[in-house]
């Protein structure tokens, strides 16, 4: 299940023991122990190689402490670089005044053998860092790709938790940018920042988070079959993607399309026009089917019915603001449509946006307000029921046919430029060809339509998706054969998916749920998805990324008394994100 170790990471006590290895030597202590006496040339070592060296050291200590290999593919690749004769020769020539080639080779061999260096061996990691700095850039990117592979499974994987300790993750970027709360520089917790101890048990997790965890798999299938119409996503998900240009920013993504796992190492390859779907399950809208607002959606299935449902909660899921009004940060969807959402005006009192965002907020609102969400309404029924509505039956089979045929067979058209709302043609239904549907609750599409709602750039989710898009774009840029000729339309795009469920009726209790040809044992039935495209301003992304990287490096420099250099490739990102001037 884990792919990195035979240890049972469902055991919080075992995971806590592993994290104690990190706690015994956090990043700041490692840097001071290793480099305070070797500051000559340290300024030229980018944080990317320091991060890779530190990861290798922690994983080696975990092996010695527990006798179990962890992140073996990453460890093997770093050890191979440490034994590379060409890199050793260059290193020996550049630092001949400090040590002989034999001494350097001996130190690197100890690193490759993962020897215990508690007795005066900290110089070994000075040489490893310098050697990694000499390695070609694509080799460094490959090492970060291996860390992503080693952390797949996310919260169920100890490597994922360890890597987040020293990462400004997408979920924590908003606080790092707005308030200067810097996760990972000095302390960390199981969510990636701000605290000193991991709390892995779900006993204290809120009902809303538990609800999202239970239903995320079903929502992913609905997106695959009804939004992407059977195009293949990244199976088994991705781990933590650490920005290969800074070594600091990181993102864990819910659902990706246009990202492949290639070669024997199964490292990721980002294709043109990749898509990221960030999933949010709206627990606060869980209602019974007989609820009048739910019935209104199922009966009318139009924008007005959905708007009424969203406004039925004391904190409406879509906040209305006038064209020139500043939104609050309470909800992640906004609307300027007074006819549908006027009632929310009095419920959320606007505040001044935080200072780092104030100059850019109007432009971000302008870019996103032109976008419209797509709503897909669902219901479920027993296929064995008497049914005079042939259209509903056809709709069921159309979606299942795509999931079973186009998704598995690949289909002829796998480009990702098309609109997520493009619907496939219906497929004729035949009972005798689909016996697996009988006796189960089959999810089918009732209707789809537009909703005048767009993402709120003041909300923390906007910043979470900003970092997801930025990090994935950097992997695409770094692996592109001709980065100077990248078409900005080929960079990854991000969509926000809001999923609303309903409770089961008495006749639906105990029945398996079938969606996209897959069986689910969810307690609830999907009612609707709201799919919202997210637009980013490359100039603002550069400002936000640069602010956080600079703030974090200065903070760590102060703690370690070392000149920490965190590389910043936001300018290259901007160049790739804007249209190129037309040649005369």
Curated annotation (Swiss-Prot):
The gene is UL98. Its main location: host cell. Interacts with major DNA-binding protein; this interaction increases the nuclease processivity of the alkaline exonuclease. GO terms for molecular function: DNA binding; endonuclease activity; exonuclease activity. InterPro entries: Herpes_alk_exo, Restrct_endonuc-II-like, Viral_alk_exo. It is an enzyme of class 3 (hydrolase). Coiled coil: none annotated. The record marks 216, 254, 278, 280 as: Required for function. Plays a role in processing non linear or branched viral DNA intermediates in order to promote the production of mature packaged unit-length linear progeny viral DNA molecules. Exhibits endonuclease and exonuclease activities and accepts both double-stranded and single-stranded DNA as substrate. Exonuclease digestion of DNA is in the 5'-> 3' direction and the products are 5'-monophosphate nucleosides. Additionally, forms a recombinase with the major DNA-binding protein, which displays strand exchange activity. It is found in: Host nucleus; Host cytoplasm. It comes from the Viruses. Residues 409-430 are annotated as: Disordered. Belongs to the herpesviridae alkaline nuclease family. Its EC number is 3.1.-.-. GO terms for cellular component: host cell cytoplasm; host cell nucleus. Pfam families: Viral_alk_exo. This is Alkaline nuclease. The keyword Hydrolase applies. Keywords: Endonuclease, Exonuclease, Host cytoplasm, Host nucleus, Host-virus interaction, Hydrolase, Nuclease.
């Amino acid at each position: 299940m884990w792919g990195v170790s035979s240890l049972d990471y469902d055991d919080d006590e075992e995971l806590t023991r592993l994290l104690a290895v990190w706690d015994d030597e956090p990043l700041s202590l490692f840097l001071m122990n290793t480099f305070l006496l070797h500051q000559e040339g340290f300024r030229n070592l980018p944080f990317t190689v320091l991060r890779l060296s530190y990861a290798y050291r922690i994983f080696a200590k975990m092996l010695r402490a527990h006798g179990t290999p962890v992140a073996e593919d990453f460890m093997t690749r770093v050890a191979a670089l440490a034994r590379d004769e060409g890199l050793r020769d260059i290193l020996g020539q550049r630092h001949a005044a400090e040590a002989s080639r034999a001494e350097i080779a001996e130190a690197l061999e100890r690193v490759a053998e993962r020897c215990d260096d508690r007795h005066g061996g900290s110089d070994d990691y000075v040489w490893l860092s310098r050697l990694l700095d000499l390695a070609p850039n694509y080799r460094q990117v490959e090492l970060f790709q291996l860390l992503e592979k080693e952390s797949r499974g996310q919260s169920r994987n100890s490597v994922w938790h360890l890597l987040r300790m020293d990462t400004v993750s997408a979920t924590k970027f908003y606080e790092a940018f707005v308030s200067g709360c810097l996760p990972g520089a000095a302390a960390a917790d199981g969510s990636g920042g701000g605290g000193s101890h991991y709390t892995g048990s779900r006993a204290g997790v809120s009902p809303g988070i538990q609800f999202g965890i239970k239903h995320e798999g079903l929502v992913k299938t609905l997106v695959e079959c009804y939004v992407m119409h059977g195009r293949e996503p990244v199976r088994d998900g991705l781990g933590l993607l650490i920005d290969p240009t800074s070594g600091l920013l990181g993102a864990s993504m819910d659902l990706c399309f246009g990202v492949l796992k290639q070669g024997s190492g199964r490292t990721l390859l980002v294709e043109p026009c990749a898509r990221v779907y960030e999933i949010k399950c709206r627990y606060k809208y869980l209602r019974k089917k007989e609820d009048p607002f739910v019935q209104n959606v199922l009966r009318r299935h139009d924008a007005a019915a959905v708007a009424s449902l969203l406004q039925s909660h004391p904190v409406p899921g879509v906040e209305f603001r006038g064209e020139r009004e500043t939104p609050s940060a309470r909800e992640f969807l906004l609307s300027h449509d007074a006819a549908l959402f006027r009632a929310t005006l009095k419920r959320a009192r606007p505040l001044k946006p935080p200072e780092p965002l104030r100059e850019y907020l109007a432009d971000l609102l302008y870019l996103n307000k032109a976008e419209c969400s797509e709503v897909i309404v669902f219901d479920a029924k027993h296929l064995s029921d008497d049914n005079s509505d042939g259209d509903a039956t056809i709709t069921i089979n159309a979606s299942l046919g795509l999931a079973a045929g186009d998704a598995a067979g690949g289909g002829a058209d796998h480009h990702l430029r098309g609109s997520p709302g493009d619907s496939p043609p219906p497929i004729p239904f035949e009972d005798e060809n689909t016996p697996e549907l009988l006796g189960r609750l089959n999810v089918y599409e009732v209707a789809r339509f537009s909703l005048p709602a767009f993402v709120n750039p003041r909300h923390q989710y906007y910043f979470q998706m900003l970092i997801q898009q930025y990090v994935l774009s950097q992997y695409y840029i770094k692996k592109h054969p001709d980065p100077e000729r990248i078409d900005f339309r080929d960079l990854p795009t991000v969509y926000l998916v809001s999923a609303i469920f309903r409770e089961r009726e008495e006749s639906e209790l105990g029945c398996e749920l079938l969606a996209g040809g897959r069986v689910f044992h969810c307690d609830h039935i999907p009612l609707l998805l709201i799919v919202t495209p997210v637009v980013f301003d490359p100039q603002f992304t550069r400002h936000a990324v640069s602010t956080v990287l600079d703030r974090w490096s200065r903070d760590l420099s102060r703690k370690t008394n070392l000149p920490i250099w965190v590389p910043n490739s936001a300018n290259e990102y901007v160049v790739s994100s804007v249209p190129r001037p037309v040649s005369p």
